[in-house]
Amino acid sequence: MDLHLSQSDGFLRVAAASPRIRVADVEGNAEVALTAVREAAERGVRALVLPELNLTGYTAADLFHNRTLLHACEAALVRILDETRELSIVFTIGLPVAVAENIYNCAAVCCAGELLGLTSKKYLPNYGEFYERRWFAPAPVDPMWIEFAGQGPVPLASVSYTHLRAHETGRNL
């Protein structure tokens, strides 16, 4: 994993992508995500964030309990990891992850063909149009180490950085 600083001023270029997602079209969404990762890498981006539940769409509702959909997501992540093996970019991609009887709303953290870990959503909204507790379990209190997408063990945990503070440079990077 070579993430050398590409700019002379010592900054890493980061980006967020918001590709068009089709509900339950895991293969199509994986292809669009791969395009976004490749384009970002070509532009010198070193860290890319893709949307929550990128592989399924956020509105898949009760389909999140469909084992075929869950297996398709894991297979798509295997493909994405394989096809990004040569890229020097860290990226996250959202997908549901089943562990035992629970399904977690996760972001897979990936780089150079490796699954570095899975960050699970801790606070699940359950009001108005949000019914996440119907489909997902909150992140486990303690990190779990699991085998997923042909790799592992990898951590599945909730990560909070509430103690960090950031400074805006005010410069167009």
For the regions a protein language model found, what residue spans apply to each?
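Enzyme catalytic cores with a strong preference for nitrogen-chemistry domains
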Residues: M1-R171
